[in-house]
UniProtKB/Swiss-Prot annotation:
Record's keyword terms, sorted: Signal, Vacuole
This protein's GO CC annotations: vacuole
Main subcellular location of this protein, as a coarse class: other
Name the record gives this protein: FAS1 domain-containing protein NCU02579
Residues of the signal peptide: 1-18
Entry keyword Signal: yes
SUPFAM superfamilies: FAS1 domain (SSF82153)
Coiled-coil regions listed: none
Chain segments carrying region Disordered: 50-74
Residue ranges occupied by any FAS1 domain in the UniProt entry: 77-225
Locations listed in the record: Vacuole
Length: 228
């Protein structure tokens, strides 16, 4: 299975989208139960309307699917796009990634190796703000910064920056090698301390290497990179 990119359409689809998937207002187990009980609607969906009292909601355009191959590595035809939905512990980030066209296409490209730094669901849920929110937007535009068509576009750009900050454009990625993420912000590297990989800057612990396939690896993180 390959990732299918999703783009924002008219606001009339917001209700259907809100019923399908709102990752930061629902638990990961709720998302998984729904993804098992119904097929993902492949129509392109816009940002959801904000829920009262909870701030703007702009989840990705479909629930991540945990239906990758049983064997995540070894086969020359298996891509990162095949395995991103396998691990339920990172399905929030997988959903964000598949909602952005360019990053999702990259994971389906055998010519572009990538190390995916995928934060745990719990790390994303514990953020002080949602991944598509930027305090600078609120400062400049107020509480309605993510309302309307312009707001949806603004949130989508912020979410893309968040996702791309977690994509390293190389694999294998040697210890100590400094490289800019796909998003092009400050250089990132990793080092091993007491047998544990840690992403720098930020000293973010790597829980494990979840998958290793022909065009890269998925590293599961206990924390989230700062995409600002």
């Amino acid at each position: 299975m390959r990732f299918t990119p999703y783009l924002v359409l008219a606001p009339t689809a917001a209700v259907a989208f809100a019923q399908l998937f709102d990752p930061l207002h629902r638990t990961a187990s709720d998302i998984q139960q729904q993804s098992q009980s119904q097929s993902v609607n492949h129509a392109q969906i816009p940002l959801a309307k904000p829920a009262v009292g909870l701030g703007p909601a702009m989840p990705p355009s479909g629930a991540p699917q945990a239906d990758g191959p049983a064997n995540a590595g070894g086969g020359s035809s298996v891509m990162l796009s095949d395995v991103m939905g396998r691990d339920k512990s990172i399905n929030l980030f997988a959903g964000f990634l598949r909602s952005i066209e360019s990053p999702s296409q990259r994971l389906d490209d055998p010519a572009r190796n990538t190390t995916v730094l995928a934060p745990l669901n719990s790390a994303i849920e514990n953020l002080p703000r949602k991944p598509w929110e930027d305090p600078r937007d609120y400062s400049a535009l107020g509480a309605n910064a993510y309302e309307g068509e312009d707001g949806q576009g603004r949130a989508q750009r912020n979410l893309r920056r968040f996702v791309e900050a977690h994509l390293i454009p190389t694999s294998p990625w040697p210890a100590g090698e400094k490289i800019k993420p796909v998003g092009g912000d400050t250089e990132v590297w990793w080092e091993e301390k007491d047998g544990v990989k840690r992403i720098q800057p930020g000293d973010i612990e790597v829980l494990n290497v979840g998958s290793s396939v022909v065009n890269g690896e998925v590293w599961i993180l206990k924390g989230v990179r700062n995409a600002s």
